[in-house]
């Protein structure tokens, strides 16, 4: 078992960290945990989202005829998570933090902290995401390029709307604590 943490803020540094894991440590899977803003009304602060897939909501080559989110030159721009890891993570969540809602859905990533309703609605309507954050899709892309199963796990810290900055500070610690409980159980099951 190898756990790695990256405090880098930009998506390319996350890809590099994932590539290092693939190249030098020959990892069997990549599991990334963190926090995110909810894009759905039924997903509340403290709940957990397990990625079914991930994509970059701020990739925009529409001037060249691409759909929003499509990465030019890539055959795939939506990266599918491992069903086996999703199943194991769901069981670990329900066992370790049964009081939380556990959702399976799309994680969308972009180089921005979403904190207004208009941006939230645009991202939700265009990309059908369950939550938004900054690095999951970059990690998923690197895992895909290396043919490594992956899972992105996000504890919800805010509602990605006008209250996001206030919610984030208040709920960040709780969201992280829930992620740690679940991750410990998941690693034990793998």
Task: Describe the residue ranges of each PLM region.
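Single conserved hydrophobic/aromatic residue that forms the stacking wall/gate
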Residues: 1-8, 12
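Short, well-structured alpha-helical segments in soluble
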Residues: 17-25
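A C-terminal functional module that forms or caps the active site or interfaces directly
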Residues: 112-159, 165
């Amino acid at each position: 078992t190898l756990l790695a943490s990256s405090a880098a803020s930009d998506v390319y540094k996350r890809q590099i960290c994932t590539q290092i894991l693939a190249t030098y440590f020959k990892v069997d899977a990549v599991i990334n945990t963190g926090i995110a803003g909810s894009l759905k009304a039924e997903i509340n602060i403290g709940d957990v989202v397990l990625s079914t897939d991930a994509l970059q909501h701020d990739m925009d080559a529409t001037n060249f005829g691409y759909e929003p989110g499509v990465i030019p030159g890539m055959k795939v721009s939506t990266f599918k998570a491992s069903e086996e890891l999703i199943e194991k993570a769901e069981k670990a969540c329900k066992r370790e933090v049964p009081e939380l809602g556990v959702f399976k859905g799309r994680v969308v990533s972009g180089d921005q902290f979403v904190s207004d309703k208009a941006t939230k609605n645009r991202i939700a309507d265009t990309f059908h995401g369950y939550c938004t954050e900054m690095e999951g899709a970059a990690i998923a892309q690197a895992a895909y390029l290396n043919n490594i199963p992956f899972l992105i796990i996000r504890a919800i810290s805010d509602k990605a709307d006008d209250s996001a900055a206030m919610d984030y500070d208040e709920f960040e610690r709780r969201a992280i604590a829930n992620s740690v409980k679940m991750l410990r159980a998941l690693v034990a099951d793998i």
